[in-house]
Each structure stands twice: as C-alpha cells, then as structure tokens.
Regions:
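Short hydrophobic/aromatic patch on the recognition helix
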Residues: 63, 185, 189, 233-234, ...
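…primarily DNA-binding HTH/wHTH and HhH modules…
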Residues: 2, 7, 236-254
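A short, Lys/Arg-enriched amphipathic alpha-helix from helix-turn-helix/homeodomain DNA-binding modules
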Residues: 142-178, 195, 199-218
C-alpha cells in the first residue's frame, strides 16, 4: 500500500494485492504535491477534500470521490469530516478501471464496496468477485464536474494567490487591479481555462461555498465571506448550481 510518513514521504509497498485501502484520521490533514505509481480513489465520508493539480483545482464533497490515474502530481487538503479514505489500484490489476481523472458520484453500493476494502486494514485477501465489482462500479459511476481550471498567465499569479483571502471581484474591478483591460483579461481566461471570466468566477464561488459549508460555516457566513449582497442572493445562486439549498447541502457533512 502507499502510506504516509513524516514530511510527506510517500512509500509504496509492492506486496499488496490488486487493491488496498488506506484511512487517515489526521485532523491536520494536508499533503503537499506528490504522486503515486498506483491509481487512487479518494473521498472523505463526512467532509470534503480539495485536490490541487498544476493547472486545476477540484472540490470533492462526501457524496463524491475523485479518481486519480498514476503519476499525476497533486496535493490534498481535507476540510471537515473525521477521516479521508484512499483506495490504491495496482496498474497490473486485471479489471477495467478508469484511465483518466474524473469525479464520481457515489451510490450506496459503491460506498459499501469502498468501506469493505478500506477498513479491512488487517485483511489483504479479498474475493476476486468483490474486487471486480468495485472496479466495475468505479468505471460505470456517473460523473460530476466540480473542477476549476486555473490560468497560468504570469500577470495573474499574484491575483490568484490573493484568492486565499478574498473572493474574486467582478471583471471591471479585477481588471483595474491587474492593470489590464477587461478585453485582455477575458481573452486570457478563455484561452487558458476555456471559460469566460464571469463563468469562471461563479465556479470559484460555488467551490468555495462547498468548502465553507463543509467546515461548518453558516449560510449567512458564507454569503458574507463570498461578498453576496444578501443571504437570499447566495441561497438563490447556490440552488441554481446544486439544485438544493445550502442548508440542505450541509446535511452531507453531518
């Protein structure tokens, strides 16, 4: 299995069977950039995780999991919840598994299969039919898009870093802060992310809202942090995107 030692030292034990589960209960969970030789299926049963790639950010709520192919550089932060679950899949596994990065919507069967493997830490032997079903359900699971492509233009680096503290401004305000025209900013965003800036900003706000809710923030607190004019405006925005209210969505994290 892949295990964690101090200072983000990752080790692979090649003796494990086709699939091995790893559960972390570290309250200060934050793994820096690293990669693995195995494919991974990662989820937080009662919290959410933020996965950062070199040019993309993904937020994974507890009703979803992320599939990471081998050798992809990534960092992981767990937000809320009591544990993080990772399944490692050997590249030599004899069953069909996803070969691309994807976010899976979990059903009750897939959740049960993941729990069966991940929490059996003292039992490395699983019946082949169980592993086959786990791989099949992972491959066939419906997909969802909770990702945010990141621009790489050097003019935007300082601004992107500031988003750790402040929500992205509307285009006119942001362009003045950067010192570029709205047309230039719009062109950069569409070229490098495939999204218009306002679309990108809405996606950022949505993912940040999910992170805040997972950390126990109130709906009103989310609205204030994300600079919505009213709590009602935030609720409307969230419901348009997620087809449920923020209060209802918070139940995933309870």
């Amino acid at each position: 299995m892949s295990i964690v030692k101090g200072n983000h030292d990752y080790i692979c034990d090649e003796e494990f069977d086709d699939v091995y589960g790893f559960v972390s209960n570290d309250n200060q969970f934050d793994w820096g950039m690293h990669s693995h030789q195995e494919s991974q299926l990662i989820l937080s049963p009662s919290g959410c995780i933020t996965v950062n790639l070199q040019s993309q950010k993904l937020v994974i709520p507890p009703n979803c999991a992320i599939w990471l192919p081998p050798k992809i550089q990534h960092s992981i932060e767990r937000r809320g919840g009591e544990s993080l679950v990772t399944l490692f899949f050997k590249s030599s596994i004899g069953y069909t598994v996803p070969n691309d990065l994807r976010v899976l919507r979990l059903n009750s069967l897939l959740i049960a299969l993941i729990q069966r493997v991940s929490y059996a830490s003292n039992n490395r032997q699983f019946h082949p039919s169980l592993i086959e079903l786990l791989c099949y359900e992972s491959y066939q699971a419906p997909l969802t898009d909770l990702s945010l492509p990141l621009p790489t233009d050097s003019r935007l680096l300082a601004w992107l870093n500031s988003l750790e503290e402040y929500a992205p401004q509307k285009l006119g305000v942001m362009a003045k802060k950067i010192g570029a025209s709205e047309k230039t900013i719009s062109r950069i965003f569409f070229k490098e992310t495939g999204m218009h800036y306002q679309e990108w900003r809405k996606r950022w706000l949505l993912l940040k809202a999910i992170e805040l809710l997972s950390e126990g923030e109130s709906v009103t607190g989310c609205a204030l942090t994300l600079d919505f004019s009213t709590t009602s405006a935030f609720i409307y925005f969230f419901k348009q995107a997620m087809h449920t209210t923020p209060s209802q969505y918070r139940k995933y994290f309870e």
